[in-house]
Amino acid sequence: LIAGLDNPDSGRVLIDGIDCTERTPAERNVAMVFQQYSLYPHMSVKENLAFPLKSRMVSVTESEINQKIDATSRTLRIHHKLSNKATELSGGEMQRVAIGRALVRNPNIYLMDEPLSSLDAKLRSELRVELTRIQRDIGGTLLYVTHDQIDAMTMATHIGVLEKGKLIQFGTPRDVYDQPSSVS
């Protein structure tokens, strides 16, 4: 609904207070990160990071693209991998590139669907901390979908609990944990 890939049954979709219900996905300035990395294997890390900035809908100079790639790759600690092909990276590095592709766009909202679930426990823990830090530093809205209670409780400022497609509870992690509205 937020990305515009489906229409709401009722109500409106507001992003930064603007009604986006009738806008196309491309007009919503939403970045998405999935569980699977979705990288272009024939491209380098730098080319993968630059790809969303080369859209006809975005007006960014080559100098700005290079600045954004440099800053983002340093933030994600993949700067030394910019010339590598995506196929030469570890799973954690590939996921960092996927996250970086979202970050370079500076969207109104980041949608992340289980971005850490396919990673090993150590890397998952490291990226959990890193994503929380990045979200705090950029101050953007990050909607993070997860089935992992640790991800939800340690990363969220607010949690929405869905059951059969319906929102059954919304609150702080502490409120949701201490006063669950459903125990099913």
Regions found by a protein language model. Name each.
Residues 17, 25, 29-36:
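ABC ATPase nucleotide-binding domain signature region
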Residues 3:
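Helix-to-loop junction immediately C-terminal to a conserved catalytic motif
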